[in-house]
Amino acid sequence: MSTIDRLKKTLNNETGAVISSPVNRRYFTGFPSSNGFLLVTTNSTVFLTDSRYLEAAEKSITVCPVDELIDAKRQIPEFFNEHKLNRILFESDRLYISDFERMKAFFDIKEPISDGSLDKAINEMRAIKNSFELECIKKAQEIAKNAFSYILGFIKDGVTEKQTALELDFFMLKNGAEALSFDTIVVSGKNSSLPHGVPSDK
């Protein structure tokens, strides 16, 4: 069962959901993008994204149809109106109140709901990893272990924190990492007391 199908089971015939955060859009579709909306009802789903991502999304996403995002103000209400839904759930954990208020007015949805119930359902789903996610975790762990072993042999007198951080990043990306979860922290000497220190020329 796909993650979208699992989400559908948390909805009822009177309720739909808008997934707008990049991290959850990717979780449900497998497709990374900086723009888009995943619209979900109990019996229908569509991923809307703009022309920059459209071709790649159509090739990559297999769990639901993909449509071009041209006019969100029109397309999103139309989708839910077609299914005769007025109660629409929005994410709250990853949505600023000001953004929710703008979206509520912008999309003209009769009963928008941002009470945490959608986030609770998604978080409970994400807490239980599927086989693909477990493989990704194992792969990331292996990359990190190999990178640490490699960088120990790279560090020597005269090599700066910045050089070490760049070498570490390059090794991980060259050996299977898609991207960095956060900026690599490489600090030494007196900088070692900084848990979120920025690599320097030291």
Model features per residue range: what roles?
Residues D71-L180, N191:
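Flexible, acidic/His-enriched mid-domain "rim/lid" segments that flank
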Residues M1-L48, L54-E55, P77, N81-L85, ...:
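Terminal domain-start leader segments
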Residues Y27-F28, G36, R126, L173-G176, ...:
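A generic local secondary-structure boundary/capping motif
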Residues A179-K202:
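Acidic, glycine-rich loop-and-beta core segments that form the ion-binding/anion-interacting portion
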Residues T49-E78:
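Compact, glycine/acidic-enriched structural inserts
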Residues L38, I137, V186:
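Divalent metal-coordination and catalytic microenvironments
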Residues S33-F37, T62-C64, K104-F106, K202:
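Short, solvent-exposed amphipathic alpha-helical segments in soluble enzyme
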Residues Y27-F28, A56-A57, S98, L194-G197:
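Short helix/loop capping segments that flank catalytic or ligand/cofactor-binding pockets
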